[in-house]
Regions:
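ATP-binding N-lobe of GHMP and related small-molecule kinases
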Residues: 1-97, 115-124, 161-162, 170-173
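Short, basic/glycine-rich phosphate-binding loops at helix/coil junctions
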Residues: 48-60, 109, 131, 204-214
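DPxDG-like acidic metal-binding loop motif
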Residues: 97-123, 139-141
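Glycine-rich beta-strand-to-loop/alpha-helix junction loops that act as flexible
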Residues: 100-102, 246-251
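Short, well-structured alpha-helical segments that form the helix of a local strand-helix-strand
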Residues: 122-133, 214, 264-267
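Conserved, helical-rich catalytic subdomain that frames metal- and/or nucleotide-binding sites
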Residues: 142, 147-243, 258-287
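Short hydrophobic/aromatic beta-strand micro-patches
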Residues: 254-256
Length: 287
């Protein structure tokens, strides 16, 4: 029996770093949004042990696989041995992009396992299992539009992002997240997101108000070799975006558009220089 789940990417409509905690993690306050750019995860009980196949290639099993770690944590939580599992991963979301693609894949696997082996499991327990593997994962369990606090594990559902189109553009390089956090720890951002104002705009279904408040404090700490991010932001604005921002620790930049025609034209224009450019829509809650 095969079970399949979509793994939507996420963007950060707002991202604020409040400080470094004594446990080594950072205290964050973010508005997160699922988008329709997604991978597909299929799980079947077959084979021997745990096998992960990504786009036809077998990923070596082992503790380094977040998918295997999550599966082991799931079956430990439900109190039964892990059966032989084969996980098929069809990738669309780019890796190391600030879009939470890896976390979304792991959580899609957990949702598959919950459907098959523990449909009565509370969503809160699934989030707790995800948190043992990564800080992004509690949000990925339910998705939609949410305020995320703490490491990202304290979630408050928010009114949905008004209907719009989102263009995502990833340059060829990646940005190491730990290095960016280190730079942020050493400085103080000049601008912080107006998250309360963004929540009011979401409640009022005010797309312009949401767009006006897009803000990611990581942008202020980008080393010069990554300043192509700002070129992409400016290009999105020239192409008609209401506003644009970097997602997560980057390097993907997204722009919000009211009309599909303008968004599609922007996608086409950016794709000439940046093959990893995508057109997406907001996605509501998953569970």
């Amino acid at each position: 029996m095969k079970i399949q789940e979509q793994a939507p990417a996420k963007i950060n409509l707002a991202l604020n770093i409040l400080g470094r905690r004594t446990d080594g993690y950072h205290e964050l306050r973010m508005v997160m949004q699922s988008v329709s750019l997604c991978d597909t995860v299929t799980v079947e009980e077959t084979g021997i042990g745990f096998a992960l196949l990504a786009d036809g290639f077998t990923v070596p099993a082992g503790k380094s696989s977040l998918e295997q770690q999550a599966a082991e944590a799931f079956f430990a939580a439900v109190g039964r041995p892990m059966p032989p599992l084969t996980v098929h991963l069809e990738k669309t979301t780019p890796a190391y992009a600030g879009l939470g693609g890896g976390s979304a894949d792991v959580v899609a696997l957990l949702r598959c396992l919950r459907r098959r082996y523990a449909p009565e499991m509370p969503v809160e327990q699934l989030r707790a299992i995800g948190l043992t593997v990564g800080s992004d994962m509690p949000f990925c369990v339910s998705g939609g539009t949410a305020l995320a606090e703490g490491r990202g594990e304290r979630l408050t559902a928010l009114p949905a992002l008004p209907d719009c189109w989102i263009v995502l553009c990833k340059p060829e390089f990646g940005i190491p997240t730990p290095a960016l956090f280190t730079l942020a720890d050493a400085g103080t951002p000049k601008n912080r997101p107006d998250i309360d104002g963004m929540i009011r705009a979401l409640s009022a279904e005010d797309l312009n108000g949401v767009a006006a408040r897009l803000c990611n404090v990581f942008e202020e700490f980008l080393p010069e070799e990554y300043h192509e991010v700002f070129h992409i932001k400016n290009r999105l604005l020239e192409l008609g975006a209401l506003n644009a921002a970097m997602s997560g620790s980057g390097p993907t930049v997204f722009g919000i558009f009211r009309e599909k025609t303008a968004a599609k034209a922007a996608e086409t224009a950016l794709k000439q220089c940046y093959p990893q450019t995508y057109l997406a829509k907001p996605v509501g809650e998953l569970v």
